[in-house]
Amino acid sequence: MAEKHQDKMTNAMNNSKLYLIQSFGCQMNERDAESLAGMLEDLGYCPTSAQEEADIILLNTCCVRETAESKVFGLLGRLRKLKVAKPDLILGVCGCMSQQEDAAKRIRRSFPFVDLIFGTHNIHELPRMIHQVQENHEAVLEVWATEKGITESIPVKRKDKLKAWVTIMYGCNNFCTYCIVPYVRGRERSRQPEDIIDEIKELVQEGYKEVTLLGQNVNSYGKDFKNNYRFADLLMAIDDITGLERVRFMTSHPRDFDQRLIEVVASAKKVCEHYHLPAQAGSNRVLKMMNRGYTREHYLELIRKIKERVPNASITADLMVGFPGETEEDFQETLDLVKQVRYDSAFTFVYNIRSGTPAAKLEQVSEEVKSERIQRLIELQNLISLENNQREEGRVLEVLVEGETKTNPDLLAGRTRTNKLVVFQGSGHLPGQLVQIRITKGRPNLLEGEVVPNGT
């Protein structure tokens, strides 16, 4: 049963205090950062982008890949001088990396100037832990070994005013052999549907047009309930919310994307026609070693069923190369899968060892081979992405305007329902408007277009 967040301590600070949160990793971490920011602003802190101005710096960490951990350790080393110059600065490390016992100990040992270390299960305790650091003038290390339910009503400070992340569940039960997430995020816990619905209704009242439902495996939503309420039921309920324009969700596990869910996403008016379905590999032998729980044939049949019901569906994926034991034949099967599915885009990455996972004990593929394979995969996917986007030329697509582009204030950018980035001229259109855009040029990573007068 959800408990209410009570540790606000609103008057503990004054408005001159500044905070900086630096997040690494996935959308779940981005959403956690919004909660961290919300709690800090409840304490009277204001955001800053300058490290030297901050009174508190939180590093919200990731441990899915070694590169993310290396970035954190490098940043901590550089922050040492700032901590010496500003001894009252509170420096904290949280998130998935600090949830690992070995990593937390390493931080404590190598960076003793860190004031605060906590994990993924107790971020709602942040106000109390800050108060403890200030009152006792000593470091606080609190990493809960296990999750203790879901804490609702944590303050949230969102950067975006049009699109919002909404977490619907936490944790993962899948235990893929390469992945550390179940060990640092805990077992699956679903939020109550009424809490999710209420949050989205409040967002709509605040002017938000689009929500993305988040979970390590959203398709597992509700499996921990005693009743039969599942993800498809939640989507139908959200689709009925007045004023909401678009609904997205991620991430989906291909094994759990069943026929009922396909029927719901095909019929729901607000659920966007974009499905992120991480394949990871195209070889049955590798998929089995990964403990993915499905075969290549199952995956391809799922894609066929989705496109049969949603012909204009955009499919994206995560694809890994260099899993331990992957042969050239295995890799060729991944390339063939990409050719058959024709992903609109894919997040491609090289396997790297995660201590504590079963795959870490297997015979590894050489770095040279992994580097060569990832380049071949990227080249293939870039070509397919370009071809897919060129097919959009001449079509008129609905675009949610997000604002000016970063490089040219005369150009606006937005997203189609299939999550394709569109750039166009149209200074009279305000962020949040839905406009009709005729696509004039397809590029590998975006579409160029022009506003259709009167939407016709």
Swiss-Prot record:
<comment type="similarity">
    <text>Belongs to the methylthiotransferase family. MiaB subfamily.</text>
</comment>
<keyword id="KW-0411">Iron-sulfur</keyword>
<dbReference type="InterPro" id="IPR005839">
    <property type="entry name" value="Methylthiotransferase"/>
</dbReference>
<keyword id="KW-0004">4Fe-4S</keyword>
<dbReference type="GO" id="GO:0051539">
    <property type="term" value="F:4 iron, 4 sulfur cluster binding"/>
</dbReference>
<dbReference type="Pfam" id="PF04055">
    <property type="entry name" value="Radical_SAM"/>
</dbReference>
<keyword id="KW-0408">Iron</keyword>
<dbReference type="InterPro" id="IPR006638">
    <property type="entry name" value="Elp3/MiaA/NifB-like_rSAM"/>
</dbReference>
<keyword id="KW-0479">Metal-binding</keyword>
<feature type="binding site">
    <location>
        <position position="179"/>
    </location>
    <ligand>
        <name>[4Fe-4S] cluster 2</name>
    </ligand>
</feature>
<dbReference type="InterPro" id="IPR002792">
    <property type="entry name" value="TRAM_dom"/>
</dbReference>
<dbReference type="GO" id="GO:0035597">
    <property type="term" value="F:N6-isopentenyladenosine methylthiotransferase activity"/>
</dbReference>
<dbReference type="InterPro" id="IPR020612">
    <property type="entry name" value="Methylthiotransferase_CS"/>
</dbReference>
<dbReference type="InterPro" id="IPR007197">
    <property type="entry name" value="rSAM"/>
</dbReference>
<dbReference type="InterPro" id="IPR013848">
    <property type="entry name" value="Methylthiotransferase_N"/>
</dbReference>
<feature type="domain" description="Radical SAM core">
    <location>
        <begin position="158"/>
        <end position="387"/>
    </location>
</feature>
<keyword id="KW-0949">S-adenosyl-L-methionine</keyword>
<feature type="binding site">
    <location>
        <position position="176"/>
    </location>
    <ligand>
        <name>[4Fe-4S] cluster 2</name>
    </ligand>
</feature>
<dbReference type="InterPro" id="IPR023404">
    <property type="entry name" value="rSAM_horseshoe"/>
</dbReference>
<dbReference type="InterPro" id="IPR006463">
    <property type="entry name" value="MiaB_methiolase"/>
</dbReference>
<feature type="binding site">
    <location>
        <position position="62"/>
    </location>
    <ligand>
        <name>[4Fe-4S] cluster 1</name>
    </ligand>
</feature>
<protein>
    <recommendedName>
        <fullName>tRNA-2-methylthio-N(6)-dimethylallyladenosine synthase</fullName>
        <ecNumber>2.8.4.3</ecNumber>
    </recommendedName>
</protein>
<dbReference type="Pfam" id="PF00919">
    <property type="entry name" value="UPF0004"/>
</dbReference>
<feature type="binding site">
    <location>
        <position position="96"/>
    </location>
    <ligand>
        <name>[4Fe-4S] cluster 1</name>
    </ligand>
</feature>
<feature type="binding site">
    <location>
        <position position="26"/>
    </location>
    <ligand>
        <name>[4Fe-4S] cluster 1</name>
    </ligand>
</feature>
<feature type="binding site">
    <location>
        <position position="172"/>
    </location>
    <ligand>
        <name>[4Fe-4S] cluster 2</name>
    </ligand>
</feature>
<dbReference type="GO" id="GO:0046872">
    <property type="term" value="F:metal ion binding"/>
</dbReference>
<keyword id="KW-0808">Transferase</keyword>
<keyword id="KW-0963">Cytoplasm</keyword>
<feature type="domain" description="MTTase N-terminal">
    <location>
        <begin position="17"/>
        <end position="135"/>
    </location>
</feature>
<dbReference type="GO" id="GO:0005829">
    <property type="term" value="C:cytosol"/>
</dbReference>
<comment type="function">
    <text>Catalyzes the methylthiolation of N6-(dimethylallyl)adenosine (i(6)A), leading to the formation of 2-methylthio-N6-(dimethylallyl)adenosine (ms(2)i(6)A) at position 37 in tRNAs that read codons beginning with uridine.</text>
</comment>
<dbReference type="Pfam" id="PF01938">
    <property type="entry name" value="TRAM"/>
</dbReference>
<keyword id="KW-0819">tRNA processing</keyword>
<dbReference type="InterPro" id="IPR038135">
    <property type="entry name" value="Methylthiotransferase_N_sf"/>
</dbReference>
<feature type="domain" description="TRAM">
    <location>
        <begin position="390"/>
        <end position="453"/>
    </location>
</feature>
<comment type="subunit">
    <text>Monomer.</text>
</comment>
